[in-house]
Amino acid sequence: MLGKHTSPHTVPGHRAPWLSPGIFCLGLPFLLGWVGLLQGHPQCLDYGPPFRPPQHLDFCSDYDSFGCCDQRKDRRIAARYWDIMSYFDLKAHELCGGYIKDILCQECSPYAAHLYDAENPQTPLRNLPGLCSDYCSAFHRSCHSAISLLTNDRGLQESHGKDGARFCHLLNLPDEDYCFPNVLRNDQLNRNLGVVAEDQQGCLQLCLVEVANGLRNPVSMVHAGDGTHRFFVAEQVGVVWVYLPDGSRLEQPFLDLKSMVLTTPWIGDERGFLGLAFHPKFRHNRKFYIYYSCLGKRKVEKIRISEMKVSLSDGNRADPKSERVILEIDEPASNHNGGQLLFGLDGYLYIFTGDGGQAGDPFGKFGNAQNKSSLLGKVLRIDVNGADVDGQRYRVPLDNPFVSEPGAHPAVYAYGVRNMWRCAVDRGDPVTHRGRGRIFCGDVGQNKFEEVDLIVKGGNYGWRAKEGFECYDKRLCRNASLDDILPIYAYGHGVGKSVTGGYVYRGCESPNLNGLYIFGDFMSGRLMALQEDRKTQKWTKRDICLGNSTCAFPGLISAYSRFIISFAEDEAGELYFLATSYPSAYAPHGSIYKFVDPSRRAPPGKCKYKPVPVKTKSKKVRFRPLAATVLDLLKEESQKAARKASNATFTSSSDRVASQKGSLKKPASSRSSKKTFRRPGTKKKSRVWSPRPQGKRKPNLDSHGVGMRQAAGRSHP
């Protein structure tokens, strides 16, 4: 979608909101993230992260504040303890009760998976936790008769009666830091339990789950707010798909507007199907709203906002004949098309338009963005629940800020916008409701800065007078009447060149993330978060990186496709992002990823919900993940290491045999001594060439990417 192309389909200065110069020539998938050696990290026996128990633990009280047991499991462990202790007299109670309680309660330890050697679900689970040698020896001396009551493992039962050393050897862990009770005493392991893990540079370590793939530039993912917990994914070409709570996709699309949507396969084309929003009362009126590029009369390019309805005969299909055009705006250029639609808490529809394109907003004396009579470069607010008296298909809210200003368009809610790419409404803190209703936007910059804004009524966001915190047009910037709203955060193009706005996390599954505004950059592929200081109301940026060993849970991945197109929130409040490895509107390389905090989860059962049933007439397409999980990669690395060690042993043995035979013969020449051993049946490796999606070879680039920049040109002066 993106960049400056000298083609009949694009214009100079044409840049997609999510792409910057010098990237789209990378045809091969570019994945971020890496996997290191598996190291200890908090993990429970169900292979999930630990949590804070919602109720007090009466028995395993050492793990009352954080661990792997809720009250139900705590009571089950207590019942087993008393069942075992019923076999002992009073003296044995005093002697062994503490040991047995300690051992049973290790299921509640935040490091339970390591104590039971259960990090990998493919390996068998221990019957007893790993005990440190001194502790194990003391337990065996005092209470070896209890072992048969604690485990039915025949090897452990046979070993304890003969030799305590043998028994303790079987319970030994390779890393003594994780055996009990050392794991309790290790300050490094317990210092930051329950908070988001950070690497040495302070980067927040999160993980991902792949939930969808094979999409053509997925630009939007929204839910209907109707209790069904479906989500609707829009592709740039104009097709919208329905995904069900079980992860499957319906075979028939919800909406197909390919014949009407204006876009091309060219990387750099920003036009297309750009926005989708469901009416707050969708469950009753079946209405939703779409934002797309189209050709009007005399081939004038327009952006169109329309209302549509869901089919009466199929709740998973739009009625193609129901489209009612709400608003059309002429586009003077093919870029900076905006594209966001959302409903505020006030029930009004907010529309986010770009400044009309080209570079520097060159239209008129002040540009479109500063011209309140233009609908370009604006945040618009309209009432779609009825028509106006003058024949317009919407009403203007009476409290819009410029309703009474001569020359200003009454639909304008805020102005001075360059090209806001992805905005979101904050649900508010789930307990205090703090922040509820705030609207966050990422506004793509020109030459130097990308910014994140909080939208306020009547606000002027500075463009083209300012870019980020700095002046862009010095003459306009010196205007005392500018009175612009500064970004809550801006970053330079050394970090990234095309911001993708995100969401404030308000979900249930990852409570540590509550209140973090998570966003990214299309060009650099960076994931970032903003954290608010409630006292100063200032925001601090935190980098997000994907964990390596911290993501060693079933189903979690630590890599993603580089080009971050959009962010999303499901009906339960969990966060996702949409990305592609090849940003063309017709290339099926887009995926959707869900954020997961591996450091802490919600207590079991807290986040359960029961979706409202929805009838499906279309066949379901089962999701098949393409990304390798961290556990898969670790297993592969382990197998490679084992093969390498085996080959080294085999080669060493062969060399010894050859040496013994050669001692009776003439010494080999220096040339023959350089030959390497190749196993029977193996062939000499040939160079592998991976084709680009277009079937072309990847261009040779110097260390500074000059070849790439020359191919791409610059998307703005």
Curated annotation (Swiss-Prot):
Gene Ontology CC: extracellular region
Region span, Disordered: 642-717
Gene, per the UniProt record: Hhipl2
Biased composition (Basic residues): 672-687
UniProt-listed Pfam families: Folate_rec, GSDH
Glycosylation sites: N647
Protein's name in the database: HHIP-like protein 2
Disulfide bonds: C203-C545, C207-C551, C423-C441, C508-C607
Family annotation (InterPro entries): 6-blade_b-propeller_TolB-like, Folate_rcpt-like, Glc/Sorbosone_DH, Quinoprot_gluc/sorb_DH_b-prop
Recorded superkingdom: Eukaryota
Organism (species): Mus musculus (Mouse)
Compositional bias of kind Polar residues: 646-662
Keywords (A to Z) from UniProt: Disulfide bond, Glycoprotein, Secreted, Signal
Compartments where located: Secreted
Major place of residence: secreted
UniProt record similarity statement: Belongs to the HHIP family.
Annotated signal peptide: 1-40
